[in-house]
């Protein structure tokens, strides 16, 4: 077993299943803009790179390039539907509690206000030592700036840091910072792309972390 001091979790698709609420808000936004709604898989493949990238890709081919309006409408709608169907993935709470003697953090491209509201409603917010969202710093994943910020904050060397995520972007971020990476296969990210990114570990359930790290 490998000793880890700092756990860095992605949010959407890793700790929390937010897909239905995100997809529904995307489609309500498109309909409000008099555009055609999209199928779930089209939306799914664009989650993970932040709201601006999400809406940019969802407008592609629509003939509309008003990204700013789309982002604003999405944020407004999603803010009212954060918890309609959103839920923790199996063993999400349990694994964070299992490693409560370590530093447990979140590094996501999702706006931090959304993350905190969801976790607060789930009574899960106090379990995390730090949370960085997509608007916390001037760079987002796969830029390693957020990860390096957390490493410096907790004075933690790369070999004691684990980056956990469902997307190749998370693995890429971890590799840029030289930390250990762990992909999760159950999330929103494309599994083939995740495998191709060659994380150090690949798990099917968060509970698998118990047998790999201490």
Map each language-model feature to its residues.
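Short, acidic loop-to-helix structural element flanking the phosphoryl-transfer center
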Residues: 4, 80-106, 112-116, 144
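An amphipathic alpha-helix signature
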Residues: 23, 27, 40, 44, ...
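Helix-loop "lid/cap" segments that line or gate small-molecule binding pockets
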Residues: 29-30, 50-64, 118, 150-151
